[in-house]
């Protein structure tokens, strides 16, 4: 379900981890073409109107479960993402980093406006060879193309 990301800005490499309340992702907004760093999801202790967590299941998006938040499509412009084996709370979970291919981005939903904006990474079933790591996987999309959740 990607608990960590790696993004580059000029010569700087940023490692971003969801548990950090200051976690933000560089997101290219589809409608405006503007690239902004947007806070990643909402943690349990954070106020706000968006759902808790930092992910949106593709099946829920497609069935209309996110419509009440009036999401906008975004592309998470990251170079790598990290998946951890096992379940949250388990000790000594191994991290696995995966490259995002050139020209691809993470499919994202952006909700809210201004300071209340949040980004959620769209997830789907993992590739068969990685099912043993996690049951949810970030959805990769070619930047600027139609996908299953627009």
Residue ranges and their predicted role:
Residues 1-150:
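Short linear sequence motif anchored by a di-proline
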